Amino acid sequence: QAVPGSASVTNGRRIFYHSPVAACSSCHRHRGRGNVVGPDLTNVSMQSDRKGLLESLLQPSLVMAPQYRPSMIVLKDGRNLTGIRLRSWVNEVLRDNKGKNRSFSRSDIEIIHELDESFMPNGLVHVLTDRELRDLLAFLEDSDD
């Protein structure tokens, strides 16, 4: 069993929204609260079991949905910008890791590289205690929240 023991949904909610260490809601939404950099985690427990959730927390770059794979844009003026590509047409729109959208003319772009590393750092959960990790997983699995 992934991280066995008792857990508190209430403490998990606090960790998700208010922990400066985990900072989950700085990138993820849950029930309409949080940021829009990474996937909305409202229904994540319907898409994965506890073991899958834990693996995503431990190794976020292992499996990334294509729409959340970061890209690096190199502009002709030498600047490098990293973000999630939102759309590409006449302008390239990139959402940075703070949730800010930036738009660039295709004519200003030298090259676009798709990256293999998620914005979510590997090992982020190692800064949480086992209890905090259980609480966070319980919150993400709770459908009554």
How should these model regions be labeled?
Residues 19-22, 44, 48, 127-131:
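Residue-level signal for short amphipathic helical patches enriched in basic/charged
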Residues 21, 62-65, 145:
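Generic structural signal for secondary-structure transition and capping sites
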Residues 1-5, 58, 79-81, 85-91, ...:
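C-terminal capping alpha-helices of c-type cytochrome domains
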Residues 33-59, 64, 69-115:
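Gly/Gly-Pro-rich "capping" loops immediately C-terminal to redox-active cysteine motifs
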Residues 12, 20-31, 41, 136-143:
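The canonical Cys-X-X-Cys-His
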Residues 1, 18, 29, 59, ...:
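Conserved helix-loop functional segments at active or binding sites
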Residues 1-19, 37-39, 49-55, 76-79, ...:
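Electrostatic cytochrome c docking/interface patches
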